[in-house]
Amino acid sequence: MKFCPKCGNLMLPDRKRKVWVCRSCGYEEPFDEEKDREKTKITKKVEHKPDEEIIVVEQDLKTLPTTKVTCPKCGNDTAYWWEMQTRAGDEPSTIFYKCTKCGYTWRAYE
């Protein structure tokens, strides 16, 4: 990755013209194939399906808002909630809930 020295946005390589281009401010900088190869290499591409389970490993839940919703596992009536974009950008985001009592996490399907 390379960032624009003028505006700080991500620069993209234009390999045909052999330059780095900032799509925000238009700044250009020469591209060196040998030196810049690692900056443009995709080392791992991860693709997710919309129905995959998403697990929040560590998060300070006390900072999340709570709402009145029934936990499908224990019946508790309060859960933390957060919103994430899990599908394409033109589709609605997904709301996740985590029970304040048992910790069970589920998503809302609207």
From Swiss-Prot:
Disruption outcome: Essential, it cannot be deleted.
Question: Which SMART domains does this UniProt record tie to the protein?
Answer: RPOL9, ZnF_C2C2
Q: Does the keyword Ribosomal protein apply?
A: no
Which InterPro entries does this one have? DNA-dir_RNA_pol-M_15_CS (IPR019761), Rpa12/Rpb9/Rpc10/TFS (IPR012164), TFS (IPR006288), Zn_ribbon_RPB9 (IPR001529), Znf_TFIIS (IPR001222)
Swiss-Prot/TrEMBL keywords: Chromosome, DNA-binding, Metal-binding, Transcription, Transcription regulation, Zinc, Zinc-finger
What GO annotations for molecular function exist for this entry? DNA binding; DNA-directed RNA polymerase activity; zinc ion binding
Binding residues annotated for Zn(2+) 1, in chain numbering: 4, 7, 22, 25
One GO term under biological process is: regulation of DNA-templated transcription
- Record keywords: Plastid included? no
Q: What is its main location?
A: cytoplasm
Q: Which residues bind Zn(2+) 2?
A: 71, 74, 99, 102
Q: Which Gene3D superfamilies match?
A: 2.20.25.10
Biological role: Involved in transcriptional proofreading and fidelity. Induces RNA cleavage activity in RNA polymerase (RNAP). Stimulates transcription elongation by RNAP on both naked DNA and histone-bound DNA (chromatin), facilitating transcription through the histone barrier. Stimulation depends on transcript cleavage. In the presence of TFS, the cleavage activity of RNAP truncates RNA back to position +15 in a stepwise manner by releasing mainly dinucleotides from the 3'-end of the nascent RNA. The truncated RNAs are able to continue elongation.
Q: Which family does it belong to?
A: Belongs to the archaeal rpoM/eukaryotic RPA12/RPB9/RPC11 RNA polymerase family.
- What protein does this entry describe? Transcription factor S
